[in-house]
A protein has these predicted regions:
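A conserved short beta-strand
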Residues: 111-123
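Conserved alpha/beta-hydrolase "acid-adjacent" motif
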Residues: 44, 147-153
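Catalytic histidine neighborhood in serine/cysteine hydrolases
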Residues: 159-173
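Post-His helix in hydrolase/transferase enzymes
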Residues: 175-188
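Gly/Ala-rich beta-loop-alpha elbow adjacent to hydrolase catalytic centers
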Residues: 94-103
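Acidic beta-to-alpha connecting loop that harbors the catalytic carboxylate
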Residues: 39, 144-146, 168-171
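Short beta-strand/loop motif that positions the catalytic acidic residue
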Residues: 134, 140-142, 146
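Short, surface-exposed "cap/lid" segments of acyl-processing enzymes
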Residues: 28-69
Length: 190
């Protein structure tokens, strides 16, 4: 008689463990990174290609929103929100320059799981005020020699969000720092 309850418990525990593993696998399959490129950049520029490769290595699916031909910040934001609405889970949002502004602006509305912002174009003339961002792990990378977005803007954003901040000896495009940026992005995905 004592053997029967144990057998039942063992079977129940095995099924529960299997369900937990299955949920974990589903969560892994649903992980997605959405890239948001800058004003004059392309959806598959060198930074995005390098970061997308690392995301795929980590088991993430990858999307890159194409804003070419769209000048309005609001229309770009709508396109990013629409891309995120189709996702099965909260995305990691990655952006560069204006794309970083868009990622930050969309983060709360799409419940982003993480933000990775490079040379974020925030608090600049002609741009709307940045809405409240998601309370999620955030990394900001900015170049000391940024000729488009003053480094102080990135520092202020990182301070306000209590984000991880990396300031590098680079310009707005951050190409010379790409190997380190890929490493920091890898840390962000863990």
């Amino acid at each position: 008689m004592l053997g029967e309850p144990r057998a039942f418990c063992r079977g129940t525990l095995r099924r529960a463990a299997w369900r937990r593993r299955l949920r974990g696998v589903r969560a892994l399959l649903n992980r997605c990174v959405v890239f948001s490129h800058g004003k004059d950049a392309e959806p598959w520029g060198s930074k995005i290609v390098a970061l997308a490769e690392r995301a795929r290595e980590r088991g993430y699916s990858v999307e890159s929103v194409d804003y070419r031909g769209i000048d309005s910040v609001e229309a770009r934001l709508d396109k990013l929100l629409a891309a995120c609405a189709a996702l099965p889970a909260a995305p990691v949002l990655v952006g560069s320059s204006l794309g970083a502004f868009l990622a930050a602006a969309a983060s709360r509305r799409v419940a982003a799981s993480r933000l990775f912002l490079m040379a974020p174009a925030v608090d600049l003339p002609g741009l709307p005020t940045l809405p409240e961002m998601a309370a999620c792990p955030t990394t900001v990378v900015h170049g000391w020699r940024d000729e488009v977005v003053p480094v102080e803007k990135g520092i202020a954003l990182a301070r306000a969000q209590r984000a991880t901040l990396h300031v590098v000896n680079d310009d707005h495009r951050l190409h010379a720092s790409l190997p380190r940026i890929v490493q920091w992005f890898d840390e962000c995905l863990r």
